[in-house]
Amino acid sequence: MVIAIPGMDSFKEVNVALANDRWMQRGVAVLSIDGPGQYESPLLGVYVSMQNWIDAGPAVVDWLLGRPEIDGQKIGVSGASFGSFFGTILTANEPRIAATAVISTCLEPGCHTIFEEASPTFKKRFMWMSNYTDEAKFDEFAKTLTWEGHVEKIRTPYLVVAGEADELSPLEHTERMVRAMSGPRQLVIYADSRHSVGNVPAANLGPFPPAPRSLSPKPSAAAKRTSPSS
């Protein structure tokens, strides 16, 4: 069972293919969500905040455990782009998550690069997602967006796939986060790839990182570069 979390300007439907879905082909059920602040959530008065994402994990897992077809010992999380941050916070604060895999990272504490050096539409959208109209107040809020003090609690397998030249979240922040973790973890870096991992030889030719074994019984090739695991 995978809880799939989209990015900042994405939506839950994009995470589940109508045919040939990679999770479903492996016999893994998918719950694709719009979490706090994502897509239609602001229209319902549910905005991005650290506390809302901390609370999201128990709410989602409790709902899943109410379904008899779900194996409560094998609930994982996947996240892409800003979903990498949201999924990390959810995992850190929900011990029933068995494994987590994220890609195309947004893991810079405070999010300075994506909000101040990239397209201004990113900041404008996130202000709407978090219910801010005053930019100065939003800038103070953005400082609270951090994995620091959270990832240290993650004890289950964690996979992160990043582009070496990520222009929205410098790689150094992802590397620092991985060093701060104490559980089993793997960092895969694709040479020359930007934020959206792919369309470079390293990503197109592989090898490709394996899915966390706690979610999939099918082994895959070894990853290109990995961090030490504990």
PLM regions with names:
Residues T156, P170-R179:
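Short alpha-helix in the alpha/beta-hydrolase fold that links the catalytic acid
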Residues Y47-I70, I89:
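Alpha/beta-hydrolase active-site loop
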Residues V178-S196:
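Catalytic histidine neighborhood in serine/cysteine hydrolases
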Residues P68-S81:
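Alpha/beta-hydrolase fold nucleophile elbow
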Residues I89-E140, T156:
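Hydrolase active-site cap/lid region
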Residues S193-G206:
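Catalytic histidine-centered segment of alpha/beta-hydrolase-like enzymes
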Residues M8-D21, G35, E172:
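The serine-hydrolase catalytic nucleophile loop
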Residues I154-R155, V160-A162, D166:
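Short beta-strand/loop motif that positions the catalytic acidic residue
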